[in-house]
Amino acid sequence: QLNYVHDSKEVSTPILETLEALAGIQNSGKIRHFGLSNETPWGTMRFLHYSETQQLPRAVSIQNPYNLLNRTFEIGLAEIAHREQVGLLAYSPLAFGALSGKYLQGNQPENARLTLYSRFVRYKKGHAENAIQSYVDLAQENGLDPTQMALAYVSSRHFLTSNIIGATSMEQLKTNLISSELELSEELLEGIEKIHGLYTNPCP
């Protein structure tokens, strides 16, 4: 069982103090391992430094956003995840469903996440829609469902441990699961990189 505890109000606890508290929890048998979330390269390396020098528990994963519209994890953290064996648990791999293309041209599907939670405006700003349309077109040109291409891309990254999918219907779940069987061609990956070069991380 994997549980992540989120406390947006607590951001000032020193890293060493956090690790010492986690050591006590681990020694009591309440947890086996722990992971980080929304951490920076510097913060991740400080956790690993204290774990090594103070003989404290070591982070085994990092849960950060990663998708075709937000690949900022690749800037520093991807190398750490790979070389230090702190694998990425990628959340929001579909960018709140935006990479399905269902919000293009101002569409607001009933009960869809960005329809219900209008405060998440990052997927409607700047070059976001241009990037989404480009990825949707690329997928369709290659006979793929845009959702499945987006998920398959995330799953193909060497620094990934788990792709955290989300679904509100059985149809969505089935579509998502099919992506685990896809292997993207070199030509398709080159197409993705071309779009990324034009619209680099429009939704960080």
Language model features with spans:
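Glycine-rich, positively charged active-site loop/lid region within alpha/beta enzyme cores that binds
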Residues: 1-4, 80-138, 204
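Glycine-rich beta-alpha junction loops
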Residues: 40, 66-70, 92-99, 153, ...
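Basic phosphate/pyrophosphate-binding loop/patch that engages nucleotide-derived ligands
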Residues: 26-27, 72-87
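Conserved short secondary-structure transition element at the edge of the structured enzyme core
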Residues: 26, 115, 121-181
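Glycine/proline-rich, positively charged
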Residues: 1-63
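Conserved, mostly hydrophobic/aromatic
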Residues: 34, 62, 81, 88-91, ...
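Generic structural signal for well-ordered alpha-helices
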Residues: 19-23, 41-48, 78, 132, ...
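Short, hinge-like loop/turn segments at secondary-structure boundaries
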Residues: 51-55, 78-80, 105-109, 180-182
